[in-house]
C-alpha cells in the first residue's frame, strides 16, 4: 500500500486462536486499500496485545471488549473513525455485536449466520431498518481462484452442458472428537447453546 492512502477498518475477534480471522485478514490485505487500525481481538486485553504486536497496530486502539471498541469509535469524527468493523467470532456473538455496532452507528461486516435464532434475526432486521447502519455478511468464496477457474471453464464450454450440480462444504476435521483434545475451533461448534 503506497503512503497512507487506505480506508481504516476495525476488527472484533479474529485473534490468534481464530481460524477465520486469518482468512479475513488475508482478504483485507488483498483488497489493497483497507487497513486494520484497531479492535478487540481476544477474550482479554493481554491476548489482544500479544496478537497485535507483530501487526504493528497502535496499542491505544486496542480494546478489552467489542463494546468498548465500538463506543470509542462512535465518539470519533471524520478520518479518525473506522469505515466499518469486521466481526469474526462464534455464531452466538454475531447478534449482540451487530446490535451494538448499529447503536453506535458503525457499519459492520459479519460472518454467517446473522443470528442463532429467528427472533434475533427479526430484531436485527428491525434495528437495521431503523438505524440505516449498513450490515453485510462476508461471502469470501467468490474470491477463491479455484472458483474463478471453474467459472472460466463453464463459460468456455470446456466441460459440456451442465445439467445438474451439487455443492457441499465438508468439515472433515470434525469427523473425530477434536473438541475433546483441546481444539478451541471445535468447542463452540459442537455446543448447542453456542
PLM features: what roles do these ranges have?
Residues 1-57, 185:
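N-terminal Rossmann-like dinucleotide-binding module
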Amino acid at each position: 500500500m503506497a503512503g497512507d492512502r487506505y480506508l481504516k477498518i476495525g476488527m472484533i475477534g479474529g485473534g490468534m486462536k481464530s481460524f477465520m480471522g486469518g482468512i479475513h485478514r488475508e482478504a483485507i490485505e488483498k483488497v489493497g486499500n483497507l487497513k486494520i487500525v484497531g479492535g478487540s481481538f481476544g477474550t482479554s486485553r493481554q491476548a489482544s496485545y500479544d496478537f497485535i504486536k507483530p501487526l504493528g497496530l497502535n496499542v491505544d486502539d486496542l480494546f478489552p471488549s467489542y463494546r468498548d471498541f465500538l463506543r470509542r469509535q462512535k465518539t470519533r469524527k471524520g478520518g479518525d473513525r473506522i469505515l466499518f468493523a469486521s466481526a469474526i467470532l462464534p455464531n452466538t456473538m454475531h447478534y449482540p455485536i451487530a446490535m451494538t455496532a448499529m447503536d453506535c452507528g458503525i457499519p459492520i461486516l459479519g460472518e454467517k449466520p446473522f443470528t442463532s435464532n429467528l427472533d434475533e434475526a427479526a430484531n436485527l432486521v428491525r434495528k437495521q431498518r431503523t438505524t440505516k447502519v449498513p450490515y453485510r455478511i462476508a461471502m469470501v468464496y467468490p474470491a477463491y481462484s479455484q472458483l474463478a477457474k471453474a467459472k472460466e471453464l463453464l463459460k468456455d464450454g470446456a466441460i459440456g452442458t451442465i445439467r445438474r450440480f451439487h455443492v457441499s462444504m465438508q468439515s472433515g476435521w470434525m469427523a473425530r472428537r477434536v473438541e475433546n483434545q483441546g481444539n478451541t475451533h471445535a468447542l463452540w461448534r459442537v455446543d448447542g447453546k453456542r
